[in-house]
């Protein structure tokens, strides 16, 4: 059921009066290709590498693994990194305003061809890995990958790599000869296989039925060999592997299947990335169906240190524009409720289709819904991601039909032009990157919303009806007095508007009409737009983006602790790099005070970590519970809730890796730290504390560990 929490907050954005032409990319630090920790100003283009362009036929697989005529969509088609590089260099992507590419997982996958139900299948998609320290030869060599990174950066494009540490490749619990038996290699040396797994590299709990979060984490996803992250060999191997790719210049990581890995391990994992020499933006895939929102999903987005693909937004956009099963009022409700639920809404990655969904464009249908959905996504909060071929109106329902070969590169398609007009606006107007959202006019077919950041504003109007024009009257706005031209130049039947005294003069929004009007100005007072990453230990360098910081260094305050001098690494009007001070761990507010002594509003919920993080599995035996009770964990550090029931860790699990009345949970805790902890039983507002003395355990200096105790009455 959709949450209906209302939120009407002022939004800040920066843009000049629109003239209907594409706006130049601002050369400010926050919008730079070098800003690897904030993607709010970017427009991402998702590519299934094998399905984009074959730039080097010499690396194509041979024999049964390759479909030269593209007739079997489960086989390789030949797309590679050279092909992507070619499309960067020929201007197709830059011409569309794309500033980040999200490519298929680049690591070595199995080469076996697997027959499922009479159809040959391959690892063309990149999700059947076997060696995270080598490249997929069908995509190219390390040299090819480095060339792709270099070409992208030279064209002001970031590169995000897909990464799937949840699993290796298909395996059978009864047939070791099936495929490659889940084999995992370390730069060519076999670490182990799913069968005869004496090292405990994998979970052996059968396949998940998706009935519980626990089942999804500790059981196999379909027939994929599920990696056991609570294993020191695995933990160190995966950390080494991601550093290899970061050292090659990757700018961001999209984690596959985050719903199916322990949140505690993932928090410790991304914290190691943020503490490395090459910290980058991270986001993960937690699939949600239409009208679905779960507390586990919200908790992950708010507490893991990683951001998420915004499935709630995507599903609603599809229902409103593609399927017409919901209204613009419903869309406004989702914008409001997600803005209230997610602490870091501007970091959620928005989209309208991807490799796991039916293509947005339907065969034989009007293209206007696709164009309007793109316009809304590009002007809404979050980081917009466009699936390859959507701008060419590619169609296809379900896997693999939604992963066809790129059909063409026509720059005259209306959808391409919509992206071309609006993507640069995210760079030039901070209202789109950082601003909040206010509904200005809404009915079942029309949505008028405003983004605002300081005095920067963008106003967007969309009419999804293909037959009815609507008179718009009484719409309020923060736009200054004046006449504003549609940024889209009438491409989607938009019009100009006049603003007087905070009200838009009455106008008619055409059937199928979409318009964007905007205003930009400089800010004299500091306004924080984003902080990246959103968690870090003392000593880590974080990036603060926004406007009005000035060019003279002053101070950044964490809670009540001011940071000045050399601990401010750099200070520019739109971006500050600062070291996290030695303050109490936990969520804290961050403010910026400029040289004039003006202090910004706070960026809340920056999560200060106690120290470097490791993963510990906490297990408690004989914790019997009454109906409605669950077991939670709390202890003496912020990562364990600081002895408060409200911040306790859990609810713990008791079905897969251990069985009731034993409960367990994998938790990210500070390394090499003397921990004290207890378990509590919770039923609503009723909390029952464990008796006896505090349990004690010293966490390891690195890796993972397990501590097992008995419940104390």
UniProtKB/Swiss-Prot annotation:
GO terms for molecular function: alpha-amylase activity; cyclomaltodextrin glucanotransferase activity; metal ion binding; starch binding. Residues 610-713 are annotated as: E. Residues 608-713 form the CBM20 domain. It catalyses: Cyclizes part of a (1->4)-alpha-D-glucan chain by formation of a (1->4)-alpha-D-glucosidic bond. Its cofactor is Ca(2+). Residues 230-434 are annotated as: A2. Monomer. This is Cyclomaltodextrin glucanotransferase. It comes from Paenibacillus macerans (Bacillus macerans). The lineage of its organism: Bacteria, Bacillati, Bacillota, Bacilli, Bacillales.
